[in-house]
Regions:
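Extended, amphipathic, non-transmembrane alpha-helical segments
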Residues: 38-40, 103-106
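Short, charged, amphipathic alpha-helical segments
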Residues: 57-61, 173, 194
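Parallel, heptad-repeat alpha-helical coiled-coil signal-transduction segments
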Residues: 13-19, 51, 64-76, 80-104, ...
Length: 209
């Protein structure tokens, strides 16, 4: 009887331990399943936000590309304007040479008219008017050249500014591309985490079963 009693006590104790272990396993499995569910939810949110961020970054990159393209077009136009300004300066130079020659001819005509005395008085008046016209032409040409120089300088400054801005936008675009790639990498990591979380959840459910 004592032996039977001892076996019964031992069996009961072992049964209690088994029940206790099963309860602990069940509690652990429930906790594991709960945490896995939370992890899956967090991963889904991360994936969704990462995809949205990636889409926004791609839109930003596209907009920056358009801005860069527009700036490059403006830079080309400014180069064209500078070329045309140089052509204007060349033309004003030619006109200036002609005005110098006219002024010299008017001076010679005035000298000849003075030598002619009374007979050359009318011619002298015409020569003086021609000289004044040549002087006004020279003055206007000087103003045109000065304004053209200012225009060219302003365009050069603008072109340099556009160049710097384009370089800055290019750097920003490169940074956006890097962030976009990092975001895509995060999405891949999140997807892998979701797979792991699902596997853990399955294990927890198997324990509960």
């Amino acid at each position: 009887d004592n032996a039977n009693g001892s076996v019964e006590v031992t069996t009961n104790a072992l049964g209690d331990e088994i029940v206790k272990m099963l309860k602990q396993s069940s509690d652990f499995a429930n906790h594991l399943a709960s945490e896995s569910s939370k992890l899956q939810s967090a991963v889904q949110n991360l994936t969704s936000s990462s995809n949205s961020q990636a889409a926004s970054l791609e839109e930003t990159a596209a907009a920056l590309e358009e801005i860069t393209s527009s700036m490059q077009n403006v830079s080309v136009k400014t180069s064209d304007v500078i070329t045309q300004s140089e052509e204007i300066k060349n033309v004003t130079g030619i006109i200036g040479d002609i005005a110098d020659q006219i002024n010299l001819l008017a001076l010679n005509a005035a000298i000849e008219a003075a030598r002619a005395g009374e007979h050359g008085r009318g011619f002298a008046v015409v020569a003086d008017e021609v000289r004044k016209l040549a002087e006004r032409t020279q003055k206007s040409l000087s103003e045109i050249e000065a304004n053209t120089n200012l225009l060219v300088q302003s365009i050069n400054d603008m072109a340099e500014s556009i160049k710097e801005q384009t370089a800055g936008i290019t750097q920003i675009n490169e940074s956006v591309a890097q962030i976009d790639q990092t975001t895509k990498d995060n999405v891949e990591i999140a997807n892998e985490s979701a797979i792991i979380s699902s596997t853990v959840s399955d294990i927890a459910n198997n324990i509960l079963e």
